[in-house]
């Protein structure tokens, strides 16, 4: 059969320096507008090479393995097999150009979505699950230098009087994320977060800037006016005169604490009845900007 096919023809169009569908900064992005990877061309038999091409050859101008132009991953090519979704996408399909749940091109998952720093995001501390939005997807980290805005159950950003009590109606529950924003005062001595049940303290988080000329974080629980055994943490991410973000993620059997988007410590529940923990007390040598909570 007469054919102008040659090896040069088969290799033409493979020099695209920035092929569509190549893994981007967010990992394996879906192929750009085109068909399902490996889909046949319109009217072709499954597995048949495109007209004028060699079996296994990439479409003209494309990168090997790239989906042919015109479709979205999961979408049948025009004129395809019976049962194919009409042009425009499959029911429930994400709009062209994005993967379900993916941020728009050129944007970072917004800092307004409550999130606990998670190990799935490069550069974050290990030891905690990622969550929707999180402790950041279930959480990407918030944009560098940005803090989440106050959530639907929080207090609008602005100076708050310290000591300050944040009501927690219904108590705390797993996947509740509490976010505290503020600035450490110069020559600070201490700050404290106290998750309270009446006069009891379920979780006492107490960074101390100068205890015997050392900086240390002390965690504890107070039941019936008696303090339990202290748990001490040597890592100390707070600096006098500098802003901070504290995030406390409630899990079924422990609290997780992150500071400035990095996981810091975990504290197992000593008080088991979480719904009775109805208030968060914030005190110490800080200027408090906001305190909020949200479910993630």
UniProtKB/Swiss-Prot annotation:
Region described as Disordered: spans on this chain: 1-150
Motif Nuclear export signal: where in chain: 272-287
Domain of life: Eukaryota
Record keywords, A-Z: Acetylation, Cytoplasm, Differentiation, Disulfide bond, IgE-binding protein, Immunity, Innate immunity, Lectin, mRNA processing, mRNA splicing, Nucleus, Phosphoprotein, Repeat, Secreted, Spliceosome
GO BP field: cell differentiation; eosinophil chemotaxis; innate immune response; macrophage chemotaxis; monocyte chemotaxis; mRNA processing; negative regulation of endocytosis; negative regulation of extrinsic apoptotic signaling pathway
SUPFAM superfamilies, A to Z: Concanavalin A-like lectins/glucanases (SSF49899)
Record GO terms (molecular function): disaccharide binding; IgE binding; laminin binding
Chain intervals with Pro residues compositional bias: 48-120
Post-translational modification: The degree of phosphorylation is higher in the cytoplasmic form than in the nuclear form. In protein isolated from a canine kidney cell line, 90% of the phosphate was on Ser-6 and 10% was on Ser-12.
Biased composition (Polar residues): 1-11
InterPro entries documented for this protein: ConA-like_dom_sf, Galectin-like, Galectin_CRD
Record's compositionally biased regions (Low complexity): 12-31, 38-47, 121-133
Modified residues (N-acetylalanine): 2
Domain Galectin residues, every copy: 164-294
Annotated Sequence repeat ranges: 36-44, 45-53, 54-62, 63-71, 72-80, 81-89, 90-98, 99-107, 108-115, 116-124, 125-134, 135-143
Modified residues (Phosphoserine): 6, 12
Binding site residues for a beta-D-galactoside: 227-233
Cellular component annotations (GO), alphabetically ordered: cytoplasm; extracellular space; immunological synapse; nucleus; spliceosomal complex
Coarse class of the protein's main subcellular location: cytoplasm
Compartments it resides in: Cytoplasm; Nucleus; Secreted
One Pfam match: Gal-bind_lectin
Region of interest (12 X 9 AA tandem repeats of Y-P-G-X(3)-P-G-[GAT]), residue spans: 36-143
Purpose of the protein: Galactose-specific lectin which binds IgE. May mediate with the alpha-3, beta-1 integrin the stimulation by CSPG4 of endothelial cells migration. Together with DMBT1, required for terminal differentiation of columnar epithelial cells during early embryogenesis. In the nucleus: acts as a pre-mRNA splicing factor. Involved in acute inflammatory responses including neutrophil activation and adhesion, chemoattraction of monocytes macrophages, opsonization of apoptotic neutrophils, and activation of mast cells.
Quaternary structure and partners: Probably forms homo- or heterodimers. Interacts with DMBT1. Interacts with CD6 and ALCAM. Forms a complex with the ITGA3, ITGB1 and CSPG4. Interacts with LGALS3BP, LYPD3, ZFTRAF1 and UACA. Interacts with TRIM16; this interaction mediates autophagy of damage endomembranes. Interacts with cargo receptor TMED10; the interaction mediates the translocation from the cytoplasm into the ERGIC (endoplasmic reticulum-Golgi intermediate compartment) and thereby secretion. Interacts with and inhibits by binding NCR3/NKp30.
Full protein name: Galectin-3
Gene giving rise to this polypeptide: LGALS3
């Amino acid at each position: 059969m007469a054919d102008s096919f040659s090896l040069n023809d088969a290799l033409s169009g493979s020099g695209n320096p920035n092929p569509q569908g190549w893994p981007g900064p967010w990992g394996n992005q879906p192929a750009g507008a085109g068909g399902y990877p490996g889909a046949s061309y319109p009217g072709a038999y499954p597995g048949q090479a495109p007209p004028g091409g060699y079996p296994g050859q990439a479409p003209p101008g494309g990168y090997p393995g790239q989906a042919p132009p015109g479709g979205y991953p999961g979408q049948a090519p025009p004129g395809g097999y019976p049962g194919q979704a009409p042009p425009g996408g499959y029911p429930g399909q994400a709009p062209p150009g994005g993967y379900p749940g993916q941020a728009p091109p050129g944007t970072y998952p917004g800092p307004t979505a409550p999130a606990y720093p998670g190990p799935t995001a490069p550069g974050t501390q290990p030891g905690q699950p990622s969550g929707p939005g999180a402790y950041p997807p279930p959480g990407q980290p918030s944009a560098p230098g940005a803090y989440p805005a106050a959530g639907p159950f929080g207090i609008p950003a602005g100076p708050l009087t310290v000591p300050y009590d944040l009501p927690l109606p219904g108590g705390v529950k797993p996947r509740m994320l509490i976010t505290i924003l503020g600035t450490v005062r110069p020559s600070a001595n201490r700050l404290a977060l106290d998750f309270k049940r009446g006069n009891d303290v379920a979780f006492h988080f107490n960074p101390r800037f100068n205890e015997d000329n050392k900086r240390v974080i002390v965690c504890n629980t107070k039941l019936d006016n008696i303090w339990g055994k202290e748990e001490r943490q040597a890592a100390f991410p707070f600096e006098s005169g500098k802003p901070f973000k504290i995030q406390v993620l409630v899990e079924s059997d422990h609290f997780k604490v992150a500071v400035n988007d990095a996981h810091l410590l975990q504290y197992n529940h000593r008080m088991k009845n979480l719904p009775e923990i109805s208030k968060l007390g914030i005190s110490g040598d800080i200027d408090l900007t906001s305190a909020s909570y949200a479910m993630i």
